[in-house]
Amino acid sequence: MTTQNRFRDNEIRAPQGTQLTAKSWLTEAALRMLMNNLDPDVAENPKELVVYGGIGRAARNWECYDKIVESLINLNDDETLLIQSGKPVGIFKTHSNAPRVLIANSNLVPHWANWEHFNELDAKGLAMYGQMTAGSWIYIGSQGIVQGTYETFVEAGRQHFGGSLKGRWVLTAGLGGMGGAQPLAATLAGACSLNIECQQSRIDFRLKTRYVDEQATDLDDALARIEKYTATGVAVSIALCGNAAEILPELVRRGVRPDMVTDQTSAHDPLNGYLPKGWNWEEYRQRAQHEPALVINAAKISMAEHVEAMLAFHNMGIPTFDYGNNIRQMAHDMGVIRAFDFPGFVPAYIRPLFCRGIGPFRWVALSGNPDDIYKTDAKVKALIPDDAHLHHWLDMARERIRFQGLPARICWVGLGQRAKLGLAFNEMVRSGELSAPVVIGRDHLDSGSVASPNRETEAMQDGSDAVSDWPLLNALLNTASGATWVSLHHGGGVGMGFSQHSGMVVVCDGSDEAAERIARVLHNDPATGVMRHADAGYDIAVNCAQEQGLNLPMVAATQGKKS
């Protein structure tokens, strides 16, 4: 059993420049990205190893963190480090094209895959919640979800408001590592937003990083600001310190009609992520240590009231959707029978992108030099010249998104495009156009890397929502393809028992060997998403598979029968 030492009063920042601490760029990349996850400009609570998402950690405790760092510094290019729930458990001889790190976080046998059992293991030092990109060392701050949220809002605007969100406003809550992307995403999509957050420190952080424009003093002030800005068609994001379980029902009582309603509180984790109404944060954290069952029940009662208010907006005909935090399930558990009457964001707005393998492609400049990102932005535009929507995103991102930690960029691209971009970035490193290598990764929220029946795989047309073979196959294939590190997690986004998901990162160090790995990984990884959706019978995915020349035996057989 590992001793629990989860607080250390220090500050971690990733090394920058071209001088290596580790033995190669492959292991240096993992080292820098682990440290970048805990940069105070990136992580939500770095002194306790918490990156984002309630208790999503980068390492199990500080002893484990120190050993991971030591292991990465000394790791050879024919060795692989194994990480078990944030703990380095072994180093094995493999080969140069094998991953340098393999990570498994938070995985439990299904019968025991619940928060109660996980929390027992966590308290004993036997487990760690890795969220999605916290424990897989590829979190890039709120930018990591901005474009996905932006794409969701834009598509909602197309479906419900004729393609424009000018003069419209979004009601939501949660300004943590994920939810903090919402105000900026809404602004970039052309909408105003009212963003409720119960911790003033999180509002302060989003104001500092320019993800939120203004803070209202109270609800009346917030509504007055919304009225003023929507009347003039100006997109401004407004934060309000308060509890969503109190404010949303009050808005319903007042007859206020937002144009769109969603939520990104950390409702997936009632013990650590959702403040019961009438409580303050300090009381919540203290009682969580001594009365966990009471705290969980109180949080879920408040979630039920929160969802009842969302249902009221839905029943008014207002577009209302779950943004993947499992709040509907929590409310349903508390007797809100119609909690699932409003949809999740993936089936409502995002699935057609997933069918083409399009998802959150991200890269990070290990040099620490922002110019390296700006040069790659230009390369993306040059290689994908006809996608005006993508170009608009990159322009807005450069203007509005402040880098957190190592400079990074995200853009949603799909099968075919990812490998093209990765190979181009590798060539830029080789030629010296970029000052140091870059890493390419993605969120676990992607087209072929997650099984999550209340989020990414909700309402699959063949009923395969809960089949989790797909993320396992994705992880295995990325390992076989030579990704630099591969991760397989449980419970990210929606909590214990509700998801399994995998991630990968590949390093562009300018070498021929890297080019071969990049070509394999960045083709095969999104191809598994097309495969998964084609197997479920989505015509968009079947057509994409045919266009891209994927060899999918059963899909080909099915198409043959149809013809």
Curated annotation (Swiss-Prot):
Residues that coordinate or bind NAD(+): 53-54, 131, 177-179, 197, 202, 243-244, 264-268, 274-275, 323, 493
Xref: InterPro entries: Urocanase, Urocanase-like, Urocanase_C, Urocanase_central_sf, Urocanase_CS, Urocanase_N, Urocanase_Rossmann-like, Urocanase_sf
Cofactor(s) this protein cannot do without: NAD(+)
Biochemical pathway: Amino-acid degradation; L-histidine degradation into L-glutamate; N-formimidoyl-L-glutamate from L-histidine: step 2/3
Active site residues of this protein: 411
Pfam families, sorted: Urocanase, Urocanase_C, Urocanase_N
UniProt keywords, alphabetically: Cytoplasm, Histidine metabolism, Lyase, NAD
Cellular component terms (Gene Ontology): cytoplasm
The enzyme's E.C. designation: 4.2.1.49
Cofactor note: Binds 1 NAD(+) per subunit.
Catalytic activity as recorded in UniProt: 4-imidazolone-5-propanoate = trans-urocanate + H2O
Location within or outside the cell: Cytoplasm
Enzyme's top EC category: lyase
GO molecular function, one term: urocanate hydratase activity
GO biological process, one term: L-histidine catabolic process
Record-stated family: Belongs to the urocanase family.
Protein name: Urocanate hydratase
